[in-house]
UniProtKB/Swiss-Prot annotation:
Name of the protein: Putative uncharacterized protein C922.09
Keyword Membrane included in the entry's annotation: yes
Main subcellular localisation: membrane
An example Gene Ontology CC term for this record: membrane
Localization: Membrane
Membrane-protein topology: Single-pass membrane protein
TM ranges: 24-44
Keywords: Membrane, Transmembrane, Transmembrane helix
């Protein structure tokens, strides 16, 4: 159980690093939010952040596609 939780935490961090440079302002806000949640390290927050990153990635891709379409 604990091992699984740690794995989830690692993938969240990896995802964060992937997205960090990609979106508006280099992702400073999401990095700050993630740091706060990671500090408390509550499994519920981990799940929330994973969801947040997935959602942000989708929105980021959508915005990028739309801007490329316009330009």
């Amino acid at each position: 159980m604990l091992q699984k939780h740690n794995k989830v935490k690692q993938t969240s961090v990896v995802r964060l690093m992937k997205y960090r440079g990609g979106h508006f302002g280099g992702g400073g806000l999401s990095t700050a939010i993630y740091s706060i949640f990671a500090f408390f390290s509550i499994p519920l927050w981990e799940k929330f952040m994973t969801f947040y990153l997935e959602l942000f990635s989708i929105l980021n891709n959508l915005v990028t596609s739309i801007s490329k379409g316009i330009l």
